[in-house]
Each structure stands twice: as structure tokens, then as C-alpha cells.
Amino acid sequence: MVTVLPGGTPQHSIAQPEPADVKPVALDLEGVRLDIPVFTTETRSLKASLIRSVTGGKLSRRGGGAVVTALQNVSCTIREGDRVALIGHNGAGKSTFLRLVSGIYQHTDGRFEAHVPVFPMIHKSFITSSELSGMQAIKAHYLLVHGNLRGFDAFCDDVVTFSGLGDFVQLPVKTYSQGMAARLLFAVLTAGTHDCLAMDEGFGAGDSSFFQKAQERMHGFLATAGTLLLASHSDPLLRQFCHRGLVFSEGSIVFDGPLEDALSYYHHTAD
């Protein structure tokens, strides 16, 4: 196996055989740091943007500019089939960690290897144009995730039926009400199964009349994920779907162990 460190040269290592009862590694992080450069610190709008988008970070000066260290010395190994709770107060680094393992952020230092594709359920909007019709948006998302249209018809039927959009799926997304757009997005992102799912509890269906139906679908969706990373403040939700906990504080993992031990550690230190 060849590992390329950021800004460095390939490092060669001989992979050791795993015991027969140990599942393959899905994600492997060692000493990972994530720095996010700040181009100016003079405007109030940037300050507000930092608060919204960077969690668990420390602002410092480096190389003539400002840098937010969002994650610091993060090390953990997640194996296929692990169901991991990300625990910590707002701003501890949970969402930033999800963005990093999903490929949205690139680490600055340390080693990070993803051996399975990670599907992020973090953003509340499509990475696409609102000029597209609902049908075109569904197809664009499917192509982005799968790289082809094999199995698309069944996927599309499921999305249209569950969202309840009917013929409105042929209209541009920009003509949808907020509730219609939220139902379409939720239906698309919870259709199918994924090898590894990274989910922030803050992701929601956005329509009160749709809530119960969405809750049932979400629980089924989480249950079918092969490997799960779930950031949440709900102990009952974490107990239902996870068996391991990572506790974050100030951009670092401060506890890694069985879920009940992790919850106990977090509540004890948070009091």
C-alpha cells in the first residue's frame, strides 16, 4: 500500500494480515489536522460566516495570514460495519469531521485513507441548478453518486412516489415551495443503500405534515447503512443505531470507545 502525506512523498508500508474475525478497514485517520485559511478578518460578515461554517476551530496567524485549525491530531480507525456516534457540543468538530471523511474538506497534515465511498447527508440543498426540473435534478444526483444510470428507473419511481410531487416533478425546482423542495431532497438522499453513510442530525425533512412519514423512512435508511457515522445530540437515537462513540472537544477526539461509556464520559465532562 502507498500512502501520500499532504505535501510529502509516497510512504511505502507492508500491509499486515488481519485476524479472520476482524472486518476490513473502512476509514483510517492518524494525526490528522485540518486548517482552513481565512483571507481577511476585518469584516463582520466573515466573522459570522466563520461561526456558521467552521466548528471546533482555533484562529491563529500563520505565514502572514489567518488560519482556523478546525481539526487537530485526530486519529481513529473505523471498520466496515461499525456504527459510530459522533458526540459533542455545538462547535466541537463533529460536522467538520463528517465533511472531511466525505471528501468535502481535504486534510492539511497527517494520514487519511478512505477504503469505501462515503455518502454525506450533511447539506440541505442539491449541488445543482434550480433551473433544472425535479426529474433532471434526480437524474443529476444519481449520475453524480453512481456514475451511470443503471437502476435509475426504480430509484426515480421511489423518489417521486415518496415525495408525493406527482407531475410537479417535471417543473423547474425554482418553482417549488420550500416544503416541496425539502420533500424532493429528502426522498432523493434517503433512496437506495450506501456502503458508508455520514449523517448530521441537523439534516431534516423540513415539512411538518411530512414529518412522521419522513421519520419512518429515515429509521429504515439508517438501519440499512453498512457503516454509519451519525452526529447527534439525541442519546436515544444514538443508542438505537450506534454501538461505538467518538467524543469531540475543540476539534479533537477526546474519547473513543463503547457507546454507553462515551455517553457517560461526555455527560460527566459536560456538567
For the regions a protein language model found, what residue spans apply to each?
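Pre-NBD coupling/linker segments of ABC/ABC-like ATPases
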Residues: V2-T69, Y266-H268
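Conserved catalytic segment of ABC-fold P-loop ATPases
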Residues: Q240-V247
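ABC-family P-loop ATPase nucleotide-binding domains
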Residues: G64-V67, P117, I122-L184, V188-C196, ...
